[in-house]
């Protein structure tokens, strides 16, 4: 995965996330199945990108900034469109950095 895909998957252009709508996009369908969960970072790409600015090697980095997060969690195994629940929180995030760019969302609260 690269920075462009990371942005597409995790940095929406809106703060108003409707999990049932957004998670039906093809990027969240894996092998014909709905993705179990996905976390959206409600922030600018520039702010998220800054997490990796000091990462000289390819590794996981914990942000010093707390981000507003919206996690969509599949609530049932059903045919598309799959039903999702939404969980919002504010916390630090862990991302995998490659070439000083976030490429993978690794976790919430710790690395």
From Swiss-Prot:
Transmembrane segments: none
Annotated positions binding substrate: 5, 35-39
One Gene Ontology term of the molecular function aspect: endonuclease activity
Protein name: Sialic acid-binding lectin
Annotated InterPro entries: RNaseA, RNaseA-like_dom_sf, RNaseA_AS, RNaseA_domain
Disulfide bonds: 19-72, 34-82, 52-97, 94-111
Keywords on record: Disulfide bond, Endonuclease, Hydrolase, Lectin, Nuclease, Pyrrolidone carboxylic acid, Secreted
Presence of the UniProt keyword Isomerase in the record: no
Pfam families, sorted: RnaseA
Complex and partners: Monomer.
Homology family: Belongs to the pancreatic ribonuclease family.
Residue positions where Pyrrolidone carboxylic acid is found in the record: 1
Active site: 10 (proton acceptor), 104 (proton donor)
EC class (word): hydrolase
Protein localization: Secreted
Cellular component per GO, a single term: extracellular region
A GO biological process held by the record: defense response to Gram-positive bacterium
Enzyme Commission code(s) on record: 3.1.27.-
Job description of the protein: The S-lectins in frog eggs may be involved in the fertilization and development of the frog embryo. This lectin preferentially agglutinate a large variety of tumor cells, but it does not agglutinate non-transformed cells and erythrocytes.
């Amino acid at each position: 995965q690269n920075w462009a895909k990371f942005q597409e998957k995790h940095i929406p252009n809106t703060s108003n996330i409707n999990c049932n709508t957004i998670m039906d996009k093809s990027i969240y369908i894996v092998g014909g199945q709905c993705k179990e969960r996905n976390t959206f970072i409600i922030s600018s790409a520039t702010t998220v990108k800054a997490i990796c600015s000091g990462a000289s090697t390819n590794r996981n980095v914990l942000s010093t900034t707390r981000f507003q997060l919206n996690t969509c969690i599949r609530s049932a195994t059903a045919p598309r469109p799959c039903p999702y629940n939404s969980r919002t929180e504010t916390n630090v995030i862990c991302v995998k950095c490659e070439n000083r760019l976030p490429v993978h969302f690794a976790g919430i609260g710790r690395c």
